[in-house]
């Protein structure tokens, strides 16, 4: 019985340390995508926010925390997601093949939890996006308009944003943007 307890305790400790690590380190993510694209990553307004445009019309935004991917937004023209989006999601290493198939079937403007990750599918007038973060971090994420606008939001559909990017509160502070008067007036944050 003691041996079984010790084995279970060790397994729980390993799982706990794996969860504490969060998603993939950014350097590993960049390497995972380097076989797919020669395009270079660029910073976008803050040192914790990086952007890649692997093909025309597709933007991959990565928000970092402690050198790891904290949130990913893959934005593309409305309709079926191009291969570059699927490569970006797969390279995270947190979603298995079955989860990626479920994401492909997600309804517009919906969210789900898969493999310990919170996944959202956003639909705008001209742009769609998939957003991914660790499930336990989803309530701490904010939303930033990608095309125009300069306010931070609690909701991805607030103020008619065509495409919203998921970011951490730390990145939001670094950007220095003002809070939206509609959805952040209460001071409550969340995805």
Question: What are these language model-derived features?
Answer:
Residues 136-191:
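Mature, structured domains enriched in cysteine- and short glycine motifs
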Residues 34-50, 96-109:
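Short secondary-structure junctions
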């Amino acid at each position: 019985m003691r041996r079984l307890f010790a084995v279970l305790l060790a397994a729980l400790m390993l799982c706990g340390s794996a969860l504490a690590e969060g998603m993939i380190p950014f350097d590993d993510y960049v390497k995972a995508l380097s076989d797919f694209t020669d395009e270079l990553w660029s910073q976008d307004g803050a040192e914790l926010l990086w952007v890649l445009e692997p093909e025309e019309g597709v933007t991959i935004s990565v928000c970092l925390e402690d050198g790891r991917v904290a949130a990913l937004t893959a934005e593309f023209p409305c309709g079926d997601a191009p291969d570059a989006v699927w490569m970006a999601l797969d390279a995270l290493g947190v979603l298995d093949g079955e989860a990626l198939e479920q994401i492909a079937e997600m309804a517009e403007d919906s969210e789900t939890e898969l493999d310990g990750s919170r996944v959202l599918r956003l639909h705008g007038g001209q742009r769609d996006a998939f957003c991914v973060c660790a499930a336990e971090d989803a309530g701490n994420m904010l939303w930033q308009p990608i095309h125009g606008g300069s306010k931070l939001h609690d909701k991805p559909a607030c103020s008619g944003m065509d495409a919203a990017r998921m970011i951490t509160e730390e990145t939001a502070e670094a950007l220095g943007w003002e809070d939206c008067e509609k959805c952040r007036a209460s001071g409550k944050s969340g995805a």
